[in-house]
């Protein structure tokens, strides 16, 4: 634990094309091995494909998709007298966003293993479309998390 208080959060700068912090976070999550220009190409192409189909701006598309993927509740383990309980807690806003983006990207990467091999732009675009329509692996992950929190609601009094 730091002795000098909390470390301040780093300020994230918006991306160059859409001037959006959320798009920049998505680019950083898609990026592998420091290849940011490749990640930017993947994200911009995916967003433009979905935006074209829905006649919306790419940033609106991403915000709609994230709204359906962000979790409100999650469970955290809490040890009480030798037993570990899964205690449901509300997710803070910055963590909601981070988890939503992470689940979108993970679900897009998983698509390759199940449904033939096609490009990451296509997989990300398909996952964003599914998220907007409230289906797909990322939305399922959110629903599973909420179901787990609902099932363990009896341990809510162990909140810390």
Swiss-Prot record:
One of its GO terms (biological process) is translation. Keywords: Ribonucleoprotein, Ribosomal protein, RNA-binding, rRNA-binding, tRNA-binding. PROSITE patterns: RIBOSOMAL_S7. Signal peptide: none annotated. One of its GO terms (molecular function) is rRNA binding. It holds the Pfam family Ribosomal_S7. Transmembrane segments: none annotated. GO terms for cellular component: small ribosomal subunit. PANTHER family: RIBOSOMAL PROTEIN S7 (PTHR11205). Belongs to the universal ribosomal protein uS7 family. NCBIfam families: rpsG_bact. One of the primary rRNA binding proteins, it binds directly to 16S rRNA where it nucleates assembly of the head domain of the 30S subunit. Is located at the subunit interface close to the decoding center, probably blocks exit of the E-site tRNA. Part of the 30S ribosomal subunit. Contacts proteins S9 and S11. This is Small ribosomal subunit protein uS7. It comes from Hydrogenobaculum sp. (strain Y04AAS1).
